[in-house]
Amino acid sequence: MDVSVCIVNLNAKQHLASCLNLLPESLGSCSYEVIIVDNHSQDGSQEFIQQEYPGFHLLINHRNEGYTQAINSAIRVSRGDYLAVLNPDSEPGPNSIFTLIEFLKMNENIGIVGPKVIASDGSFQRSCRRGVARPAAVFSYFLGLAKRYPNDQRFTGYHLNHLDENEINEVSGVSGSCMVIRRKTLKDIGYFDEQFFAYQEDSDYCLRAKERGWKVYYNPHSIVKHRGGMGGANSVPMKAIFEWHRSYYKYYFKHFADDYSMIFNIFYSIAMVGKLIFAEGKYLIKQ
């Protein structure tokens, strides 16, 4: 088995067919299996998958334990030499996953690779390639400095805006909306860290891979369209906002807190709580 395509679904029925129907063309000549974990959807997703895609392996969670727990469930039963982690609101382009797998086959020291990800309108999703999310890079992103000064590397350390989006580059992380992982890398570093309910589990996983000596690459010769925020995030927006901020907090304290003073760690905590309150307040006002 060449590749196991692993998808976590939560109330994304309206987008599933677009994703699943494009898989054969995206995989080229690869032999593959598709494993879908449904995270307690309430929109008829489970019945839809069972009726329309009986050849796919469906795992059903009876409550939402979080994205990371669900993707690990899929990985544990997978058999492929490569793992393609894919969001249900993603639309993989022709030979997109095949291209990433061939890239890994030609580069034995690369453990993880991600494609160029575009939005529905064709615009580039900068979050598909990442630097290390240290405080300076994260705050530049939060404050909009990276977007305002896209060519200034003092501010673009997180989404690497200064790099050409059409060039292959080594990066520190790629997006879990679509990433391909070598089985040997999985055996070396283990599963995704389930302390992350959702969000930043992909950045954490890539950083762990790099710490073990694996390289992580962005390859724009593979293109995947990602609607973003559909399904799970849209189902419970306040929960999504909370988990997004909590994951950044956990990521920082897992990897970087020991590099900074206690005073700075307190400041970081206060800043994240403040941003969470602002984000949730902004959402409620819009309602």
Predicted feature locations:
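Conserved donor NDP-sugar-binding/catalytic core segment of glycosyltransferases
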Residues: 91-127
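Short, acidic, metal-binding catalytic loop of nucleotide-sugar glycosyltransferases
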Residues: 21-31
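A conserved acidic beta->alpha catalytic loop
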Residues: 22, 38-47, 63
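A short, conserved alpha-helix in the catalytic core of glycosyltransferases
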Residues: 163-223
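Glycine-rich, basic loop-to-helix element that forms the pyrophosphate-binding segment
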Residues: 61-78, 99
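Active-site-adjacent helix/loop segment of glycosyltransferases
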Residues: 207-286
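Short, flexible, basic/aromatic active-site loop/helix in glycosyltransferases
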Residues: 132-172
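Short aromatic/hydrophobic "clamp" motif used to bind/position activated sugar donors
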Residues: 83
